[in-house]
From Swiss-Prot:
UniProt organism field: Nitrosococcus oceani (strain ATCC 19707 / BCRC 17464 / JCM 30415 / NCIMB 11848 / C-107)
This protein's pathway: Metabolic intermediate biosynthesis; chorismate biosynthesis; chorismate from D-erythrose 4-phosphate and phosphoenolpyruvate: step 6/7
Cellular compartment(s): Cytoplasm
Lineage, opening ranks: Bacteria, Pseudomonadati, Pseudomonadota, Gammaproteobacteria, Chromatiales
Record-linked NCBIfam families: aroA (TIGR01356)
Catalytic residues (UniProt): 326
A GO biological-process term: aromatic amino acid family biosynthetic process
Coiled coil: none
Domain of life: Bacteria
Keyword Transferase included in the entry's annotation: yes
Binding site for 3-phosphoshikimate: 32-33, 37, 178, 180, 326, 353
Group of enzyme by EC: transferase
Protein name (Swiss-Prot/TrEMBL): 3-phosphoshikimate 1-carboxyvinyltransferase
Amino acid sequence: MQPIEEVSQDTMAFVVAPGGALRGRLRVPGDKSISHRAIILGALAEGITQITGFLEGEDTLATLQAFRDLGVSIEGPEGGRVKIHGVSLQGLRAPEKPLYLGNSGTSVRLLAGLFAGQSFDVILRGDESLSRRPMRRVCDPLARMGAFIETTAQGTPPLHIHGGQSLYGIEYAMPMASAQVKSSLLLAGLYASGRTCVVEPAPTRDHSERMLAGFGYPVEREGAKVCIQGGGTLHGTVVEIPADISSAAFFMVGAAIGKGSDILLEHVGINPTRTGIIDILRRMGAEIEIRETGVVGGEPVAAIRVRASRLHGINIPEDLVPLAIDEFPALFIAAACAEGETVLAGAGELRVKESDRIQVMADGLQALGISAQPTADGIIIQGGELQGGEVHSHGDHRCAMAFAMASLVAKGPIIIRDCANVATSFPGFLELACGAGLAIRHGK
């Protein structure tokens, strides 16, 4: 196994040697979705909120800094521990300048709903990638609630959210499954008169609903509909954040494809709205064992053991797509290593993530000798032998980490360009991957 080389901070490439196996017990960083929501609700609560397991990645730190800019006293993060002195729903102060949210689409969409109910104006901006992300899907239903939000002509950030608006509860049937849109409307609903209800066309992650309840705020669930009544109170609490299944996904796929691999991923969140990765890999023939199950802060957790398996291609059921939407870059690598054809449809959302993940992954797989045919809302991948080569992640952290795992079965080294954004979701990825058996280093 090659050591990690010390290089300058502006290095943008990973170089991964071929072969190897993943072995041992691993714990990936805390869940990104839950970390965002813990900061938001902790800031809006009355009293103190203590968080452990907080993900100290660039995206979640952007959310944390935004609330400091809004006058919230936050201690940490230090070793995943954060202490928030909540200011209550009406206690935020107007920021002195626009809030910079980096590459975090979660931050801008969730905070758009929150700031729609404030008495002051807020401008949300981000980096070049975030400035291309679509925001009308959240701004349009917020406008129906009475919000006044300006975007670019293309419906992208920066967002100028005008304060002093009176919000009214609505019932909104989402045209596309999106946990971010749902959560944004629920946050706006905290400030709305009456009842705010969101109806989902398919299940999405329910961390916001679970955490609102954990902070003492009543949440009603009726099948595909979730509702809250405005004007309540959040109470500070203790939040323990499990390991992120989206980060664990790379090691799950790596262990499934890497000959001789056998890993145990510890204390992973297995919220049933997030376990599509497990269901899909099992359908492909992966040997996955769930053990040491428990519940932490209202979220189910478990250890996940994955061993090298013989995978076969499948038609991925569309009802599993929302349950694995962030894990498809890793799953595309599994498909490339499987016998036969894997077909994905109904996943158009992948084209408007941090990158066009369908195209970026297809281009990379083709560069590595795999037949990968993009479609409007999915991809068709023919399993085969991965060659070495150079691929480009286009600044997408999940694509970069997925291609790194491909090296376990590649015939030659893989060079992955534009990897700086891996720090948005998985600080310490190289160190953990290297320790598990991946021959990965920084390069030029």
